[in-house]
């Protein structure tokens, strides 16, 4: 169960990072 929320959080972080990169471009 702990890995479940951890995987979801990691996915959200990756998505946010992608948006940040586009803004920097």
From Swiss-Prot:
Keywords: Cytoplasm, Ribonucleoprotein, Ribosomal protein. This is Small ribosomal subunit protein eS32. The gene is rpl41. Component of the small ribosomal subunit. The ribosome is a large ribonucleoprotein complex responsible for the synthesis of proteins in the cell. The keyword NAD does not apply. It is found in: Cytoplasm. Residues 1-25 are annotated as: Disordered. InterPro entries: Ribosomal_eS32 (IPR007836). Component of the small ribosomal subunit.
